[in-house]
Amino acid sequence: DFSAPAKTKTGWQEAEEIAKKFHIQDINFVKPGIGETTRVLLRRMPWKILVRDKKDTEYIGHILKLAEEKSVAVEEYPLQTYRACGLIRDLHADV
């Protein structure tokens, strides 16, 4: 049936799924997109960086370099809407 719209995941849905998978209580600690991920690495307390493909250096090369400089883990994750997603460390969470 081609009359039904294709079911695609929205960016918001993907961010919510990431928050749930990584037990992040505040959705504001999930920063999807190349720009937001870069900002997390430059101005925030990053916990982990998720990338669709570590070999995608044309788009995320600077993210990989910043993560290495700051000793932040980079994990390949099956992102569908974004190439990268920064996860911010919750300084108030019980670890």
Question: What are these model-derived regions, one by one?
Answer:
Residues D1, D26, D53-D56, D90, ...:
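Acidic-enriched, low-complexity/disordered segments with a strong bias for Aspartate over Glutamate
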Residues D1-M45:
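Ribosome large-subunit tunnel/peptidyl-transferase-proximal elements
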Residues E14-E17, E36, E58, E68-E69, ...:
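Glutamate identity and glutamate-enriched acidic tracts
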Residues N28, P32, L41-I60, L64:
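Extracellular/luminal Protease-associated
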